[in-house]
């Protein structure tokens, strides 16, 4: 058997209460380890950061306007507050699995990942390319690895919807980043 072991990082959705997402992260990690790779799953410490500084009032006002216009279909205005209140309850059943089997590396942001730490990055699986679930979306296309000599692979990545959730500038930037991938597999046709 050829020695193909690489230090590999998995970039996926936050590991907390999505049972399917947790199982997919575990399965991908296990499959890569079975192939001989040294695998780390990256997980953000603050999974839903609150808007900061001068930007915050505008973010909340924008959400409030959308909520007014769309009713219950609009975004929750202070969703970060509810998230922080409910997360300990919701993750009580999943945190043991995550800690025991996935054993993620907790990071404050993807900028914490240093240039020579990993030889490969795998994005997936699940709805990692959905801006509503992954912010900033450019990091789901490995923007933080720009200029690095690493392998970039998307595995079973999904947009999660047939409605475009990208701003034009995001779409153009993510398409440019995707050109730098060595392999791409997606769920959608």
Q: Could you say what each language-model-derived stretch is?
A:
Residues 1-5:
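Short, Lys/Arg-enriched N-terminal segments with co-localized hydrophobic residues
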Residues 12-19, 23-176:
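Aromatic- and Gly/Pro-rich donor/ligand-binding loops
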Residues 26, 188-189:
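Alpha-helix N-cap/helix-start capping motif
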Residues 181-188:
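A short beta-strand/loop micro-motif in the catalytic core of glycosyltransferases
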């Amino acid at each position: 058997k050829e020695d193909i072991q690489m230090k590999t990082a998995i970039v996926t959705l936050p590991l907390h209460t999505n049972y399917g997402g947790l199982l997919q992260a575990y399965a991908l990690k296990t499959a890569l380890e079975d192939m001989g790779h040294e695998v780390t799953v990256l997980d953000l410490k603050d999974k839903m950061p609150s808007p900061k500084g001068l930007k915050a009032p505008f973010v909340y006002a924008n959400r409030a306007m959308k909520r007014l216009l769309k009713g219950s279909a609009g975004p929750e205005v202070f969703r970060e507050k509810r998230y922080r209140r409910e997360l300990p309850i919701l993750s009580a059943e999943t945190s043991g699995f995550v800690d025991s089997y996935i054993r993620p590396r907790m990071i404050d942001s993807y900028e914490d990942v240093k240039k020579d730490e990993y030889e490969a990055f795998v994005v997936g699986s699940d709805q990692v390319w959905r801006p509503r679930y992954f912010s900033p979306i450019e990091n789901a296309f490995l923007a933080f690895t720009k200029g690095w000599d690493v392998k970039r692979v998307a595995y079973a990545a999904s947009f999660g919807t047939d409605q475009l959730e990208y701003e034009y500038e995001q779409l153009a930037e993510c398409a440019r980043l995707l050109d730098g991938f060595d392999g791409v597999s997606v769920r959608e046709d």
